[in-house]
Amino acid sequence: TRRSSDLTECPVFHLDLNTGKYESVQSLLDTLNEALTAWEQEYGAVEAERNVGLRFKGVVQRAYEKTGQRVAILVDEYDKPLLQNIGNNELQEELRGILRLFYSVLKTQDRYIKFGLLTGVSKFSKLSVFSDLNNLEDISLNRNWASLCGITEEELHSGLKPAVEEMAESNGLTYEETLDRLKEMYDGYHFDRDSIGVYNPFSLLNALKNKQFNDYWFETGTPSFLVEMLKRTNYELNHLAHEEQTSDMLNSIDSVHRN
Protein backbone atom coordinates (compact mmCIF):
# COMPACT_ATOMS: atom_id res chain seq x y z
CA THR A 1 0.00 0.00 0.00
CA ARG A 2 1.36 3.37 -1.00
CA ARG A 3 1.20 6.22 1.48
CA SER A 4 0.07 9.67 0.36
CA SER A 5 3.54 10.94 1.26
CA ASP A 6 4.98 8.58 -1.37
CA LEU A 7 2.97 10.21 -4.17
CA THR A 8 4.50 12.96 -6.30
CA GLU A 9 2.36 15.93 -7.29
CA CYS A 10 2.35 17.02 -10.91
CA PRO A 11 0.76 19.91 -12.82
CA VAL A 12 -2.79 19.08 -13.93
CA PHE A 13 -4.49 20.67 -16.92
CA HIS A 14 -8.24 20.03 -16.72
CA LEU A 15 -10.46 21.14 -19.59
CA ASP A 16 -14.25 20.73 -19.34
CA LEU A 17 -16.01 21.12 -22.68
CA ASN A 18 -19.32 19.82 -21.37
CA THR A 19 -20.76 23.13 -20.17
CA GLY A 20 -20.28 25.17 -23.35
CA LYS A 21 -22.77 25.92 -26.12
CA TYR A 22 -20.80 25.83 -29.35
CA GLU A 23 -22.84 27.77 -31.89
CA SER A 24 -19.82 29.40 -33.52
CA VAL A 25 -16.07 29.10 -33.86
CA GLN A 26 -15.67 31.96 -31.39
CA SER A 27 -17.63 30.13 -28.69
CA LEU A 28 -15.13 27.25 -28.79
CA LEU A 29 -12.18 29.64 -28.86
CA ASP A 30 -13.60 31.49 -25.84
CA THR A 31 -13.77 28.24 -23.85
CA LEU A 32 -10.23 27.23 -24.78
CA ASN A 33 -8.83 30.71 -24.18
CA GLU A 34 -10.43 30.88 -20.74
CA ALA A 35 -8.72 27.65 -19.72
CA LEU A 36 -5.40 28.67 -21.27
CA THR A 37 -5.45 32.04 -19.50
CA ALA A 38 -5.91 30.35 -16.12
CA TRP A 39 -3.01 27.97 -16.81
CA GLU A 40 -0.79 30.81 -18.05
CA GLN A 41 -1.44 32.77 -14.87
CA GLU A 42 0.20 29.93 -12.99
CA TYR A 43 2.96 28.94 -15.40
CA GLY A 44 3.54 32.07 -17.47
CA ALA A 45 2.62 33.31 -20.94
CA VAL A 46 4.55 34.24 -24.08
CA GLU A 47 3.14 36.99 -26.28
CA ALA A 48 4.35 35.34 -29.48
CA GLU A 49 2.06 32.35 -28.85
CA ARG A 50 -0.95 33.65 -30.73
CA ASN A 51 -3.21 30.63 -31.28
CA VAL A 52 -4.66 28.02 -28.95
CA GLY A 53 -2.29 25.32 -30.19
CA LEU A 54 0.86 27.35 -29.57
CA ARG A 55 -0.40 28.58 -26.20
CA PHE A 56 -1.21 25.07 -25.04
CA LYS A 57 2.13 23.79 -26.29
CA GLY A 58 3.99 26.57 -24.50
CA VAL A 59 2.22 26.34 -21.16
CA VAL A 60 2.72 22.56 -20.99
CA GLN A 61 6.46 23.01 -21.47
CA ARG A 62 6.66 25.85 -18.94
CA ALA A 63 4.75 23.81 -16.36
CA TYR A 64 7.32 21.04 -16.72
CA GLU A 65 10.23 23.46 -16.53
CA LYS A 66 8.79 25.21 -13.46
CA THR A 67 7.93 22.09 -11.46
CA GLY A 68 10.32 19.48 -12.84
CA GLN A 69 7.33 17.15 -13.20
CA ARG A 70 5.62 15.92 -16.34
CA VAL A 71 2.02 17.09 -16.58
CA ALA A 72 -1.36 15.34 -16.51
CA ILE A 73 -4.00 16.38 -19.04
CA LEU A 74 -7.70 15.68 -18.42
CA VAL A 75 -10.39 16.57 -20.98
CA ASP A 76 -14.09 16.07 -20.25
CA GLU A 77 -16.39 15.63 -23.28
CA TYR A 78 -13.69 16.18 -25.89
CA ASP A 79 -16.30 15.70 -28.64
CA LYS A 80 -19.03 18.05 -27.36
CA PRO A 81 -18.45 20.89 -29.88
CA LEU A 82 -18.77 18.48 -32.82
CA LEU A 83 -21.77 16.60 -31.45
CA GLN A 84 -23.67 19.84 -30.92
CA ASN A 85 -23.33 20.61 -34.62
CA ILE A 86 -24.33 17.40 -36.35
CA GLY A 87 -25.94 18.47 -39.60
CA ASN A 88 -23.95 21.72 -39.82
CA ASN A 89 -21.03 20.36 -41.82
CA GLU A 90 -19.38 23.72 -42.45
CA LEU A 91 -19.24 24.76 -38.80
CA GLN A 92 -18.35 21.24 -37.73
CA GLU A 93 -15.35 21.24 -40.05
CA GLU A 94 -14.13 24.57 -38.65
CA LEU A 95 -14.51 23.33 -35.09
CA ARG A 96 -12.73 20.11 -35.99
CA GLY A 97 -9.77 22.13 -37.27
CA ILE A 98 -9.48 24.03 -33.99
CA LEU A 99 -9.73 20.88 -31.90
CA ARG A 100 -7.16 19.13 -34.09
CA LEU A 101 -4.77 22.05 -33.55
CA PHE A 102 -5.35 21.98 -29.80
CA TYR A 103 -5.14 18.22 -29.33
CA SER A 104 -2.02 17.94 -31.51
CA VAL A 105 -0.09 19.12 -28.45
CA LEU A 106 -0.64 15.65 -26.98
CA LYS A 107 1.85 14.41 -29.57
CA THR A 108 4.23 17.34 -30.01
CA GLN A 109 4.73 17.74 -26.25
CA ASP A 110 4.65 14.05 -25.41
CA ARG A 111 7.98 14.24 -23.58
CA TYR A 112 6.43 16.67 -21.08
CA ILE A 113 3.22 14.67 -20.53
CA LYS A 114 3.01 11.95 -17.88
CA PHE A 115 -0.62 11.05 -18.36
CA GLY A 116 -3.61 12.07 -20.45
CA LEU A 117 -7.26 11.04 -20.28
CA LEU A 118 -9.93 12.22 -22.70
CA THR A 119 -13.56 11.24 -22.18
CA GLY A 120 -16.52 11.58 -24.50
CA VAL A 121 -19.73 9.88 -25.56
CA SER A 122 -18.72 9.06 -29.11
CA LYS A 123 -15.90 7.48 -31.07
CA PHE A 124 -14.23 9.41 -33.86
CA SER A 125 -12.28 7.90 -36.70
CA LYS A 126 -8.56 8.43 -37.15
CA LEU A 127 -9.41 10.90 -39.91
CA SER A 128 -11.03 13.26 -37.44
CA VAL A 129 -9.68 15.38 -34.57
CA PHE A 130 -6.91 12.89 -33.75
CA SER A 131 -5.65 12.30 -37.28
CA ASP A 132 -2.20 13.65 -36.38
CA LEU A 133 -1.82 11.48 -33.28
CA ASN A 134 -0.47 7.97 -33.02
CA ASN A 135 0.11 7.87 -29.26
CA LEU A 136 -3.50 7.55 -28.08
CA GLU A 137 -5.03 4.31 -26.85
CA ASP A 138 -8.78 3.73 -26.89
CA ILE A 139 -9.59 1.98 -23.61
CA SER A 140 -13.40 2.00 -23.99
CA LEU A 141 -13.54 -1.79 -24.40
CA ASN A 142 -10.20 -2.68 -22.84
CA ARG A 143 -10.33 -5.41 -20.19
CA ASN A 144 -7.55 -3.80 -18.16
CA TRP A 145 -9.81 -0.81 -17.56
CA ALA A 146 -13.19 -2.58 -17.53
CA SER A 147 -14.04 -1.50 -13.97
CA LEU A 148 -12.86 2.10 -14.30
CA CYS A 149 -16.26 3.69 -14.98
CA GLY A 150 -18.43 1.72 -12.58
CA ILE A 151 -18.69 0.28 -9.09
CA THR A 152 -17.73 -3.36 -8.67
CA GLU A 153 -19.45 -5.95 -6.49
CA GLU A 154 -16.46 -5.94 -4.15
CA GLU A 155 -16.57 -2.15 -3.79
CA LEU A 156 -20.30 -2.27 -3.04
CA HIS A 157 -19.84 -4.91 -0.33
CA SER A 158 -16.88 -3.18 1.31
CA GLY A 159 -16.90 0.59 1.00
CA LEU A 160 -20.68 1.01 0.63
CA LYS A 161 -21.90 -1.59 3.13
CA PRO A 162 -23.13 0.97 5.74
CA ALA A 163 -25.19 2.76 3.08
CA VAL A 164 -26.71 -0.53 1.93
CA GLU A 165 -27.63 -1.39 5.52
CA GLU A 166 -29.34 1.98 5.97
CA MET A 167 -31.25 1.51 2.73
CA ALA A 168 -32.34 -1.96 3.80
CA GLU A 169 -33.68 -0.66 7.11
CA SER A 170 -35.49 2.23 5.40
CA ASN A 171 -37.27 -0.14 3.01
CA GLY A 172 -38.04 -2.91 5.47
CA LEU A 173 -35.73 -5.34 3.67
CA THR A 174 -32.89 -7.55 4.77
CA TYR A 175 -29.34 -6.69 3.79
CA GLU A 176 -29.26 -9.55 1.27
CA GLU A 177 -32.64 -8.59 -0.22
CA THR A 178 -31.39 -5.05 -0.73
CA LEU A 179 -28.26 -6.29 -2.46
CA ASP A 180 -30.37 -8.45 -4.78
CA ARG A 181 -32.62 -5.51 -5.66
CA LEU A 182 -29.66 -3.20 -6.30
CA LYS A 183 -28.08 -5.83 -8.52
CA GLU A 184 -31.29 -6.31 -10.48
CA MET A 185 -31.74 -2.60 -11.14
CA TYR A 186 -28.24 -1.14 -11.48
CA ASP A 187 -25.76 -3.95 -12.26
CA GLY A 188 -24.89 -5.68 -15.53
CA TYR A 189 -22.54 -3.29 -17.35
CA HIS A 190 -19.58 -4.95 -19.06
CA PHE A 191 -16.87 -3.12 -21.01
CA ASP A 192 -15.21 -6.21 -22.46
CA ARG A 193 -16.18 -9.79 -23.16
CA ASP A 194 -16.25 -11.87 -19.97
CA SER A 195 -14.97 -8.87 -17.99
CA ILE A 196 -15.98 -7.98 -14.46
CA GLY A 197 -19.48 -6.51 -14.23
CA VAL A 198 -20.01 -3.06 -12.74
CA TYR A 199 -22.89 -1.05 -11.36
CA ASN A 200 -23.99 2.25 -12.89
CA PRO A 201 -22.36 4.68 -10.41
CA PHE A 202 -24.86 7.52 -10.94
CA SER A 203 -27.89 5.31 -10.37
CA LEU A 204 -26.41 3.26 -7.53
CA LEU A 205 -25.14 6.22 -5.52
CA ASN A 206 -28.41 8.10 -5.94
CA ALA A 207 -30.37 5.05 -4.82
CA LEU A 208 -28.23 4.71 -1.71
CA LYS A 209 -28.43 8.43 -0.96
CA ASN A 210 -32.21 8.64 -1.38
CA LYS A 211 -32.84 5.12 -0.04
CA GLN A 212 -35.24 4.51 -2.93
CA PHE A 213 -35.15 2.14 -5.91
CA ASN A 214 -35.81 4.47 -8.85
CA ASP A 215 -34.73 4.71 -12.50
CA TYR A 216 -32.17 7.44 -11.85
CA TRP A 217 -30.52 7.12 -15.26
CA PHE A 218 -33.38 9.20 -16.71
CA GLU A 219 -32.03 12.18 -14.75
CA THR A 220 -28.76 12.13 -16.66
CA GLY A 221 -30.61 13.43 -19.71
CA THR A 222 -30.76 12.24 -23.30
CA PRO A 223 -27.77 13.20 -25.47
CA SER A 224 -29.03 15.79 -27.95
CA PHE A 225 -26.82 14.35 -30.68
CA LEU A 226 -28.55 10.96 -30.29
CA VAL A 227 -31.96 12.57 -30.78
CA GLU A 228 -30.64 14.36 -33.86
CA MET A 229 -29.23 11.16 -35.33
CA LEU A 230 -32.52 9.33 -34.78
CA LYS A 231 -34.39 12.13 -36.56
CA ARG A 232 -32.07 11.94 -39.55
CA THR A 233 -32.24 8.16 -39.91
CA ASN A 234 -35.93 7.53 -39.09
CA TYR A 235 -34.83 4.55 -37.01
CA GLU A 236 -37.51 2.50 -35.28
CA LEU A 237 -36.67 2.61 -31.57
CA ASN A 238 -38.43 -0.67 -30.84
CA HIS A 239 -35.85 -2.39 -33.06
CA LEU A 240 -33.19 -1.59 -30.47
CA ALA A 241 -34.78 -3.80 -27.81
CA HIS A 242 -33.08 -6.98 -29.01
CA GLU A 243 -30.31 -5.53 -31.17
CA GLU A 244 -26.80 -6.93 -30.80
CA GLN A 245 -23.53 -5.64 -32.25
CA THR A 246 -20.01 -7.02 -32.28
CA SER A 247 -17.08 -5.20 -30.71
CA ASP A 248 -15.67 -4.70 -34.21
CA MET A 249 -18.82 -2.84 -35.19
CA LEU A 250 -18.62 -0.62 -32.11
CA ASN A 251 -14.97 0.15 -32.82
CA SER A 252 -15.80 1.24 -36.36
CA ILE A 253 -18.45 3.77 -35.40
CA ASP A 254 -17.84 7.43 -36.24
CA SER A 255 -20.62 9.49 -34.69
CA VAL A 256 -20.05 12.51 -36.88
CA HIS A 257 -20.02 10.69 -40.19
CA ARG A 258 -21.57 12.93 -42.79
CA ASN A 259 -23.69 10.27 -44.49
Please annotate each region the language model reported.
Residues 14, 72-76, 97-101, 114-121:
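Structural recognition of the conserved hydrophobic beta-strand(s) that form the central parallel beta-sheet
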Residues 27, 43-61:
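Short glycine-rich substrate-engagement loop in P-loop NTPases that contacts/grips substrate
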Residues 1-4:
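Short, small-residue-biased leader/transition segments that mark boundaries at the very start
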